[in-house]
Swiss-Prot record:
UniProt-recorded name of the protein: Early nodulin-5
Biological role: Involved in the infection process during the plant-rhizobium interaction.
Recorded superkingdom: Eukaryota
UniProt KW keywords: Nodulation, Signal
Biological process terms in GO annotation: nodulation
Signal peptide from the UniProt entry: 1-12
Gene symbol of the encoding locus: ENOD5
Amino acid sequence: IIFSMWLLFSFSESTEYIAGDSESSWKVNFPSREALIDWATRHQFTYSDTVVNEDEDHDCNTKIHSKLGDMVVTKRPLVLPPLITLPLSPSPAPAPNTSGAAAGCGFMAFLEVSVAMLMFLIWL
């Protein structure tokens, strides 16, 4: 099931693209991704007759259109901070066996967990 879902998502592609907002939207049909790239390079999007590239977008204030109106973004963080920081917990894996006794216990635990997970996936 997981493989078939991956296969479906990896080979699915949209061939209709909607451009514009809800009032003045229009559909563009493209037979392939290369046609979309060619169209985008011929039709550069502008704001107030000024082309805004990626460097200018990160370096200066940029107006972004939203449904509530124009929103001014002053500076975007390069990396978003995590929403939740979890404390470090001890590893659930057993400590390495240095005494020499019962040398295969770690592998047996791994095998039991693997078989249990496989049975759970088959049950789904």
